[in-house]
Amino acid sequence: MAFPGCPYIQEKRQYLKEIIMSARMNNPATILPDASDGIQTMLKAVYKGGVPRKTLELVHLRASQINGCSFCVDSGARSAKKAGETDERLFAVAAWRETPYFTDAERAALALAEAVTRLADRSDPVPDEIWEEATRHYDEKGLAAIILMITITNLFNRVNITVRQPAGEATW
């Protein structure tokens, strides 16, 4: 343990323990069950959209990494593993541009996920080149599935970050 006697470190650890170990409230979608039902219906449609499950899980994981949602990064990695994703690729998602592990179609989906998640970062949030690359790999139904996965993920991220949902606790 580094700096065991340092009051600042001890205070910071206690603060982190308090905010990380318990949520501020129950998941709002469980408080308003109709909301949860609607989200689950959308997710079912996304998974029927013709995009490989592993690709959708990578999109979810990347958006969650960008937003800093520990709950969604944890659950996203677990879901990707269940879908057959490898550790090698999971470890490389944050650096997908610099690794050889992803197909061109997956790269297009990841680029779209980053653009849609970072809407405020530029005046043209989803540039034509990102959109056109995505349309080279996915038909309209596939694009719809990817876009909805990105937006649902951003919804999950914002809910879980707001209520400080701890990683590892199932709430959805």
Regions found by a protein language model. Name each.
Residues 2-172:
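Hydrophobic alpha-helical segments
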